[in-house]
Structures are given as C-alpha cells and as structure tokens.
From Swiss-Prot:
Family recorded in the similarity comment: Belongs to the thiolase-like superfamily. FabH family.
Extent of the signal sequence: none
UniProt KW keywords: Acyltransferase, Cytoplasm, Fatty acid biosynthesis, Fatty acid metabolism, Lipid biosynthesis, Lipid metabolism, Multifunctional enzyme, Transferase
A Pfam family annotated for this UniProt entry: ACP_syn_III_C
Domain comment, as recorded: The last Arg residue of the ACP-binding site is essential for the weak association between ACP/AcpP and FabH.
EC numbers on record: 2.3.1.180
Catalysed conversion reaction: malonyl-[ACP] + acetyl-CoA + H(+) = 3-oxobutanoyl-[ACP] + CO2 + CoA
Gene Ontology molecular function terms on file: 3-oxoacyl-[acyl-carrier-protein] synthase activity; beta-ketoacyl-acyl-carrier-protein synthase III activity
Name by which UniProt lists this protein: Beta-ketoacyl-[acyl-carrier-protein] synthase III
Active site, UniProt feature: 114, 260, 290
Cited function: Catalyzes the condensation reaction of fatty acid synthesis by the addition to an acyl acceptor of two carbons from malonyl-ACP. Catalyzes the first condensation reaction which initiates fatty acid synthesis and may therefore play a role in governing the total rate of fatty acid production. Possesses both acetoacetyl-ACP synthase and acetyl transacylase activities. Its substrate specificity determines the biosynthesis of branched-chain and/or straight-chain of fatty acids.
Pathway named in the protein's UniProt entry: Lipid metabolism; fatty acid biosynthesis
Start and end residues of each stretch annotated as ACP-binding: 261-265
Amino acid sequence: MKNKEVRILSTGKYLPPISISNHDLSKIIDTNDNWIKTRTGIEKRRITKGENTSDLGTKAALDALRKGGISPEELDLIIVATITPDYFTPSTACIIQRNIKAYNAFAFDISAACSGFTYGISIASQFIRNGVAKKVLVIGVETLSKLVDWKDRNTCILFGDGSGAAILTESNEKGIMNVYLGSDGRGADLLKCKSSSLTVNSDELKELLNSKEEDLENKFIEMDGKEIFKFAVKVMIKGIEKVLKDSNLELKDINYIIPHQANLRIIEHVAKKLGIDENKFYININHYGNTSAASIPIALAEVDEKGLLKKGDNVILVGFGAGLTWAASLIKWI
C-alpha cells in the first residue's frame, strides 16, 4: 500500500500579554537598548505571569484548531516540543490533551531545544505516512523566564515566552517535502541548564533573585555564545542546502525561509554566506526574542496569518539548539 502524503492544515500561536522592553531591562541590569539591539536585534520579549507552559500551549492549540475548522476529537496525536515542561511527569502534551479535551489522541513530549518543533514535524509526518494517525497537532512552547538569570545581561536579554502550533493532516498532495535532522552531543556543554526545578513560575522569580549565590547554582541557562554563534551559522547553511538538494530545488525556488529566531546577526551571516537577500528570511526576533522551540511555529503562524504564502509556495524551516541539535524542513504550502 502506498504511503500517504502530509500537509499543514493550519497554524496557531499564543504570546503572553506582558512585554518587557530593552529599556525595562536597563532598570535591573547594566545594559541599554542600543547595546542589546546592536548585538542581537532584539527590542522586546514576552513574559508569562501566572501561566504554565501547558497554558500557553493550550491557547496555541485552540487557535490552530479554530483556524483548521476541526474539533479536538479529530486529533490522533499531540506532540509537544519543549525544554520547560510543567513537570518531569506527566508530559505537557498530556496536560494540553486534557485541557482541549482531545481524548482520542495519544500524546507525548520531545526535547530537542530550539530544533524541537521541526523534529516534531518529522515525527508527525512519519506517523501519518505510516497510517498510524490522520491528524497530528505539533506544538512548540516555552516559558524560558523560568530558567533565565535576570542578573546575567548576556542571557536574560535573549529569551522570551510563547507558543506556536501546527496541525498536520494526510493529503493527496505532498506538503512536507523533506526533513533533515542532526545532533552532536560533543557540544552538549556549550548550551545547557541543569535546573532541578522545572516549575519555577513568575511569582517565584523574586525569591530566586533574592537567594544566596550558592542556592542559584545550576538553576539557569548557561551558554558559550561565541561557539554557539559559529555552530549556528554552519548548521543553518548545511540544513538549507541539504533540504534544497533532496527536493531538487534551488534558493530561487524558495519564497520564505523561517529561521529559528535566536540572534539577528546569525541570520544576517547565513544570508550573506548563501548570497541571498535578508528579506527572504522572515524575522520577528525584534518583538519576541528567542523563544526556543516556540520560535519557528510562532513565525510560521504569523506568516500564515499575514497571507504571505500562497498555494504552491515553498518555505524552509531551519533551526538549531542545545544538544547540540539542528533541523530543517522544506514545505510546500498547499
């Protein structure tokens, strides 16, 4: 029996309402708007208050369901990509399943950091092609404000909270053209968080900030920024070139590239090395900062909402993250 094809039915997103500007950060750490924008391209980021990761994921899921015109009962599988789950167990996916009442679906989490959503797209596609599922909800969601050291200007300026989602469905036409995934554990220590508490919420941040230094050890994100920058540029180019080659397409055939929104300077370097206009990349890092697994689906949902993609257009999703991991996918909009 011939395997089924897969396409994206709908997308959704949710951003918490609290926006923290660079100017706001300058009141609590030694930084300023120009310093942050010059190095990262970030102007502001969203932060949760009183919301868990599952709450953000639930709202993005409901948005995608509404736009797709389907009920939660029609979902066969829910995949949540996150490094900031509500708990060690149960999975955030199961909590979201309960919240949206998608009781016919099975659900699980994956942890691939900023590459997680594209990993989820790959997994969902395989379940559909193999006939195990017909409709799959893939969510990328993070509440990174739990893991940010608000005294460290090198990291707290970068991250934000948010959630994006996509519903994949079986199709007669091929929408998910190619996926390329990779990882290299030799770089595991370049970007890490050894936090023993995954349920720190915004109300507890003040307590953490007033704690003794030894109490804070290992609770926050640690990153070798220079090495991550070099790694990111290399694997993003590698990922883009790989999915183009496997799809027998060229850069001129691509309408949009949706990159992981980690640092505007990374995207600029990739564009320069590929010899393409930066306008081919969809960029929203100035509004939201780095939302890890949520960054690509949030951007995809925005592109969808704005009507920037028409039937037959080609879009590349490409990202990188802790692990080290990287992922790219070439999608035809149908």
